[in-house]
Design a protein with these regions (language model features):
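Amphipathic, Lys/Arg-enriched alpha-helical "gate/interface" segment within cytosolic domains
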Residues: 1-118
Length: 118
């Protein structure tokens, strides 16, 4: 199953970015694919959840994510991340600052999906 795919949650279409337990190289490769997909959608229309459970973050991964979140910003209606205390606050803050986006963090995919469609 493709880790980047649209799913339906409570009748709404949500883009799932499933980075669960991915290596740094996998996260970098997958995050580089995201903007091309999202920018094909109408502006302000995409609900997106990124699940980073079990990912070991480093500065390289953060740089890839910063770029992707900045490029796709106009197309995002709402976004949420799933993190399990694996992203240091300073790195999370640098992504938020660079992308000029507020990205709420949840401890489970279900909670993140519920937030997106609420």
């Amino acid at each position: 199953m493709d880790p980047i795919r649209f799913v339906t949650h409570q009748g709404q279409r949500v883009l799932l970015l499933d980075f669960t337990a991915s290596t740094p190289d996998q996260v970098a490769e997958l995050s580089s694919r995201v903007p091309e997909l999202i920018t094909q959608e109408p502006k302000g229309s995409v609900l997106v959840v990124a699940d980073f459970s079990g990912v070991k973050f480093n500065r390289e991964i953060v740089e890839h994510i910063k770029i992707a979140t900045a490029i796709d910003r106009p197309h995002i209606k709402r976004a949420a991340w799933v993190l399990t205390e694996n992203l240091p606050k300073a790195l999370y803050d640098s992504i938020r600052s660079f992308s000029a986006r507020e990205i709420p963090v949840f401890d489970s995919r279900e909670k993140a999906l519920d937030y997106l469609v609420s």
